[in-house]
């Protein structure tokens, strides 16, 4: 029989309650690392009730000094109608370049534009490969936009000084959003 710090013996019910309470406290929140380009370089925990989803996409073929659009596609578990209404918090875009990529590459997230060249003039933040950290961080720019509107109204724009082959850049977008609603029970008769 174990004893508590006071020296009194705990009965089985008290031991089980103590173990259960410790288990409930072990909740790990995903972390958005605030990029160095934003000036603070401090890792931030997501707010309570929020989680982070990563969207990863490869680039299409890009001609030299041309801007192309890359659409944002929701993962399957968020494409359910109930989850499309979840509100967005912060967004981070990170660039992953192959060693063969030459010249400056820029990426931004804005509303869909008629002319892709206009996108960088309206962007709140731009991930630039010529900077120390190729990332863009949107703190309040798209706050409280739903995930459905994020997919429908926003687009990632990519600019390259040199011509790029397809799949030579990985664009990773981390979106902090309200926790999704999962179906917790299954019934074959429902």
Curated annotation (Swiss-Prot):
Keywords: Capsid protein, Ribonucleoprotein, RNA-binding, T=3 icosahedral capsid protein, Viral nucleoprotein, Virion
Record's subcellular location: Virion
Region (Disordered) location: 1-20
InterPro entries xrefs: Bromo_CP (IPR002009)
GO molecular function: RNA binding; structural molecule activity
Pfam families: Bromo_coat
Gene Ontology CC entries for this record: ribonucleoprotein complex; T=3 icosahedral viral capsid; viral nucleocapsid
Top-rank taxon: Viruses
Main location: virion
SUPFAM superfamilies the UniProt entry points to: Positive stranded ssRNA viruses (SSF88633)
Biological function: Capsid protein. Probably binds RNA and plays a role in packaging.
Further details from the record: The virus has a tripartite genome (RNA1, RNA2 and RNA3) and an encapsidated subgenomic RNA (RNA4) from which the coat protein is expressed. Virions are icosahedral, not enveloped, with 32 capsomers per nucleocapsid.
Family, similarity comment: Belongs to the bromovirus capsid protein family.
Name of the protein: Capsid protein
Organism: Broad bean mottle virus
